[in-house]
Amino acid sequence: MKNFGTMCISLATAAMLFTGCGALKGGAIGGAAAGALGAGIGALAGGGKGAAIGAGIGVAVGATAGALIGKKMEKQKAELEAIEGADVETVTDNNGLDALKVTFDSGILFATNKSDLTATSKASLDKFAISLLQNPETDVTIYGHTDSTGSLEVNQRISLQRAQSVQNYLQSKGIEAGRIVKVEGKAYTEPVASNDTAEGRAANRRVEVYISANETMVEQAE
């Protein structure tokens, strides 16, 4: 696992913004709607607390199928760990299956207060997209985060725009829009470090991408 200093690898739960907004398969959703949707799909278990990921398959997945999916995720994790600027962690989705959380430090992806991807970040996302294309039976969820500098409104907009920049770039590299099931900006509502220090604020500025088994992968594993 690569450690780039300012990179953060955990997702904490905070109150949902009443102005929160995001995108679900291309459509905009408000904070309340996103919260309701997340509750309906199911919340990520373990380190992710509150991030709704995983196909809503509605049935229990057997141990054998779960083990097969775990092996596939472990293989992809090894691929992703070679990407500059990406920190990869195994988490558990709402179906109890292994999933991956890939955290990109916003300092690597974007210039300060900008949502346009840098040339360096595009090189990393090119490799990330290749891994997604080679593992097509997965869904992708993207969250943007900021530190607490500035107003809630400004940070909400920037966090969403950054998440959407990653979404749009991945789609430009051949990732089908239907695979990206949720894109949301969370502003500074889910800090992973103190915003009282420069180091903490840097850790809080990040984009998180979750990779989880879709229904096809689950069906094939059973």
Residue ranges and their predicted role:
Residues M73-K101:
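Amphipathic, membrane-active segments
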Residues E84, G96-L100, F104-S106, N113, ...:
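Envelope-exposed proteins and targeting segments
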Residues G22-E81:
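Short, low-complexity, glycine-enriched hydrophobic/amphipathic alpha-helices that associate
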Residues L109-Y143, Q171, A202, V209-Y210, ...:
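Periplasmic peptidoglycan-binding/anchoring modules of Gram-negative envelope and division proteins
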Residues M16-G20:
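C-terminal motif of bacterial Sec signal peptides marking the signal peptidase cleavage site
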